[in-house]
Amino acid sequence: MTQDHPPVLFVGAGPGDPELITVKGQKALARADLVIYAGSLVPEAVLQWTPASARILNSAGMTLAEIVTEMENAWLEGQQVVRLHTGDPSLYGAIFEQMAKLSQRQIPYTVIPGVTAAFAAAAALKVEYTLPEVSQTLILTRMAGRTPVPETESLENLAAHRATM
């Protein structure tokens, strides 16, 4: 492993409003040589902080292997790689597979969290998810899609906890 190369950065782009990207995420984009983002999910306006010299790839049509190869090749050249995900990359961000592939190649990486849509929604609606003597627990879940939801995590089972959902 080349120690002087910067780590690959997994950056949360926030919930869609370009002004809700974190300062740390914005700074990461500002020094990026390669940005790989999901064009179907991340608005192009979030890329406004990326230097004109940066290479920008839309991952919508790319396989996991292609994404990892692009990240590896750029990292081996000493470039700053940013993998831009919606919201917070650690929540439904599908970064586990990418991190595992980078670890196999001994490529360091760092995760820069982002604002998740759940909390942006609470702010927009002016609501609080936890209230004294009402609920001190928040459960985040999603509907089944390409990835199924385990039966033990059905809405009925989760609602039995009487927590905020």
Model-derived features: where do they sit?
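Class I S-adenosyl-L-methionine
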Residues: M1-V115, A120
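Beta-strand/loop-alpha-helix module characteristic of Rossmann-like adenine-cofactor folds
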Residues: T2-V8, L76, V81, Y109, ...
